[in-house]
Amino acid sequence: MSALQTSPINLDLDLAFHPANDDALTSLVDADTKRRLTHASPWQQDLTAWIESVRRDPTLTCPEIVRLSPMLSLGLQLTDDATITELNHSWRQRSESTDVLSFPALDNSLVLPTDTCVELGDIVVSVQTAQRQAKQHSHELGLELRWLVSHGLLHLLGWDHPTDQSLKTMLSYQEQLLSINGKVHHH
């Protein structure tokens, strides 16, 4: 096992963030959630903390290149049901909306110089579906968005949930991630 990366990472979300384009929705939410819908900085803070948490724990699934790289990049798109339905159909052959899609870009067989920025992939979240789920679970939209983005991130890092037990483990770790920067979410 190699030495784990302990220096801060430079997570590039500024150029890869695609905000929600729903003025009607952003007028109905609190200031923090509105900021999450329109700005990369809250996501950069959360994602950096979450990735650092995963990188520090050698028992957690995380590609070696992610543990060692000082610079990481990923895309985050907040979209609507129509767009995520199109993506779900194109990539998963499912003609239905979903809450979050992840498109991992990592190739674990690559050997890159340690100063290379590693592209993790893209996370796409349907804000409309997140809003319905937040209402269903009786919590704020901002919390549901954080839940979905943390789920997408774990998929980019190689996590999956083909069994009930693996899903339970993944959801439990998501709760730990959300507690790093604030409110815990119980799904």
UniProtKB/Swiss-Prot annotation:
SUPFAM superfamilies, per database record: Metalloproteases ('zincins'), catalytic domain
Pfam families named in the record: YbeY
UniProt cross-references to PROSITE patterns, sorted A to Z: UPF0054
Cofactor field: Zn(2+)
Coiled coil: none
E.C. code: 3.1.-.-
Sites where the protein binds Zn(2+): 151, 155, 161
One Gene Ontology CC term in the entry: cytoplasm
Annotated localization: Cytoplasm
Record text on cofactor binding: Binds 1 zinc ion.
Database matches in InterPro entries: MetalPrtase_cat_dom_sf_prd, YbeY, YbeY_CS
GO BP term, example: rRNA processing
Keywords in alphabetical order: Cytoplasm, Endonuclease, Hydrolase, Metal-binding, Nuclease, Ribosome biogenesis, rRNA processing, Zinc
UniProt enzyme class: hydrolase
Family of this protein: Belongs to the endoribonuclease YbeY family.
Function noted in UniProt: Single strand-specific metallo-endoribonuclease involved in late-stage 70S ribosome quality control and in maturation of the 3' terminus of the 16S rRNA.
Name of the protein described by the UniProt record: Endoribonuclease YbeY
Organism of origin: Prochlorococcus marinus (strain MIT 9313)
